[in-house]
Amino acid sequence: MKSQGQHWYSSSDKNCKVSFREKLLIIDSNLGVQDVENLKFLCIGLVPNKKLEKSSSASDVFEHLLAEDLLSEEDPFFLAELLYIIRQKKLLQHLNCTKEEVERLLPTRQRVSLFRNLLYELSEGIDSENLKDMIFLLKDSLPKTEMTSLSFLAFLEKQGKIDEDNLTCLEDLCKTVVPKLLRNIEKYKREKAIQIVTPPVDKEAESYQGEEELVSQTDVKTFLEALPQESWQNKHAGSNGNRATNGAPSLVSRGMQGASANTLNSETSTKRAAVYRMNRNHRGLCVIVNNHSFTSLKDRQGTHKDAEILSHVFQWLGFTVHIHNNVTKVEMEMVLQKQKCNPAHADGDCFVFCILTHGRFGAVYSSDEALIPIREIMSHFTALQCPRLAEKPKLFFIQACQGEEIQPSVSIEADALNPEQAPTSLQDSIPAEADFLLGLATVPGYVSFRHVEEGSWYIQSLCNHLKKLVPRMLKFLEKTMEIRGRKRTVWGAKQISATSLPTAISAQTPRPPMRRWSSVS
């Protein structure tokens, strides 16, 4: 599949518009009546209902998609998504793509909602006998017309008996008639709780779309479901005004609540995202722990580049930066205790803690090779331990391995692990507290890579996007993850980046302008 902005068919075709419509006509001719109904159902909420009701063929639906800018010759991905969902995967060849390519892009480009996907899955699991029983249970409230399982569910939705946040009626029906479908509903609830909500792609972001995607939906779920069940409930929503001062950028962070798969409700995750406004003269403190040398582990060549650019960028953003090099376990505890009690937090809006070192699953190494759990580090800055940071965003960026696997797919090194050490569970990594963000250079179980001269891919990309995307810094963590998928070592390995929760950040342009860094590609 070619990147967005390029045709999925030969650009040498004459009369491209006709050629594209011919492809749509071929797809139409291979779809039956039920396929058309499925397409119409999946487009509810994206295409006006009146237009869908009048559509009698797939080509009618395609015409509406074209009119609504949901489908174009340059970007037919939404149609590919629809064909994938209704299991017409053979027809993807007419869009010059494969089901594997669609699966890879779905986590970041999915248009059909989880709720609509759920209803479609349920409709396929409700046979004629099940449907008859369900209709019998709701006989008094249903019209006297013949219904399919799909139209039955669509009617319940239209009547307001079910919606994405209210599945009680549906659960009761399934529990009575077809209990096995309750698994689908529970799966939907879990996915909705951990869903990464991304804003529409802007023009600047288009260049990132269509490239090889970095993190599959499975990777994301694995990471988020590893978090503690009670963690990061969004009990606070800090608001400190809305005016930038001192020429530094005003940062607004949304969705800083935790992403525990079992406890995060939908309103918290998608509708009531916390908003933090930063309007003080002092943005806050940025602490950088930069470990280069170790007792027996390999030196981390290039880490000074990461520390240097982190320091420069966060100073540019208005933070006071403190760098600590080659920190032992005892020294780390001293740093944590000092920062926990630092009176400067009272005058700041935010706290940033960056760790550049070797690591393992859920833990990082000190320079004397003591393994320190990430949770232990973060727990110093909860509202109870550090009241001055209560209801303020606390951002932790960690450049370190989280496992030993290399994701298959210049001089490069992994931020290596000591295989003799026992792994630490990520379930103990996150404090049960609001207002934390944890950004890891890679998902659990995988190594992260560092160029011995230019620094790590994760940190360099993070800083590059912090600079480049001001003032519309809406997806810098997601973009940091995306660009990781395009970086490869000489042996064809790629790095998987991870963040622990959905986050969007916007900022005003700092003054004076920041100079370019030649070390960042």
Swiss-Prot record:
Protein name as it appears in the record: Caspase-10
Substitution effect: residue 147 to T: In GASC; somatic mutation; impairs CASP10-mediated apoptosis
Keywords recorded for this protein, A-Z: Apoptosis, Disease variant, Hydrolase, Protease, Repeat, Thiol protease, Zymogen
Catalyzed reaction equations: Strict requirement for Asp at position P1 and has a preferred cleavage sequence of Leu-Gln-Thr-Asp-|-Gly
Disease: Autoimmune lymphoproliferative syndrome 2A: A disorder of apoptosis that manifests in early childhood and results in the accumulation of autoreactive lymphocytes. It is characterized by non-malignant lymphadenopathy with hepatosplenomegaly, and autoimmune hemolytic anemia, thrombocytopenia and neutropenia. Familial non-Hodgkin lymphoma: Cancer that starts in cells of the lymph system, which is part of the body's immune system. NHLs can occur at any age and are often marked by enlarged lymph nodes, fever and weight loss.
Tissue spec: Detectable in most tissues. Lowest expression is seen in brain, kidney, prostate, testis and colon.
Natural source organism: Homo sapiens (Human)
Lineage: Eukaryota, Metazoa, Chordata, Craniata, Vertebrata
GO MF terms, alphabetically ordered: cysteine-type endopeptidase activity; death effector domain binding; ubiquitin protein ligase binding
